[in-house]
């Protein structure tokens, strides 16, 4: 071996030794990006534990986006945007989680009975009817009338306490699945129909009927004559909380 070759070999040995010392612990494992923080990142938890009134977004993406429209006493810990529900069903208010969540499986229902609802109404009539924010056909309804305990327990499978002193009245928690939630218990002050109804945006709404009629309905308490009307026409000035009723037909009979 020539002196030049020996010198070159010696230099290479020193270079390799220096690289090994600079590396430190000698770990030469090549780590892929999938072995790092991305793999250890925990999956986001669903903003709800269970849901009866699930809604799927119209966005054509996969996994799809879901939102739970259940009204609850307290949102799940994973919910980021918990908003107050209008006209909540619980004492002290109700809340809805408005988060959208991307998942293949939105999770189980909270109320197993919703899978086999009875088509029979638990109530004969209802003034404070509420349509649930679900999208089946026919729709789902709940009656929030305050009843005497004996009335509620006789008609409903489940009752809850109404707001106010305890013990007091009860509210039926049963859900009815059908197209017709039934008649009102308290008659509308203007009768069964109205052409000129004015209602606020509450749920249920408070309404007035400005129809000019030959005579007010028997249930009207504040019946006033329209000025300068000949023959005389009348308007019921009462307010009513609930649906104002269908349009009167034919209009000429008013």
Curated annotation (Swiss-Prot):
Concerning Gene3D superfamilies, the annotation shows: Cysteine Protease (Bromelain) Inhibitor, subunit H
**Disulfide bridge map:** 51-248, 125-185, 126-143, 152-159, 156-172, 193-248, 194-209, 199-207, 216-223, 220-236
Q: Where is the signal peptide?
A: 1-22
The sequence repeats lie at 46-120, 121-187, 188-251
List the propeptide residues. Answer: 23-118, 252-254
Q: Which tissues is this chain's protein expressed in? A: Expressed in roots, leaves and flowers.
Cross-referenced Pfam families, in alphabetical order?
Bowman-Birk_leg (PF00228)
Q: Which UniProt keywords apply?
A: Disulfide bond, Protease inhibitor, Repeat, Serine protease inhibitor, Signal
What are the GO cellular component annotations? extracellular region
Its induction note reads:
By wounding.
Residues annotated as site: Reactive bond for trypsin: 135-136, 201-202
Family annotation (InterPro entries): Bowman-Birk_prot_inh, Prot_inh_BBI
Top-rank taxon: Eukaryota
- Identify a single GO molecular function assigned to this protein: serine-type endopeptidase inhibitor activity
The record's comment on protein family reads: Belongs to the Bowman-Birk serine protease inhibitor family.
State what protein this is by name.
Bowman-Birk type bran trypsin inhibitor
**Organism listed in the record:** Oryza sativa subsp. indica (Rice)
Q: Which gene is transcribed and translated to give this protein?
A: RBBI3.3
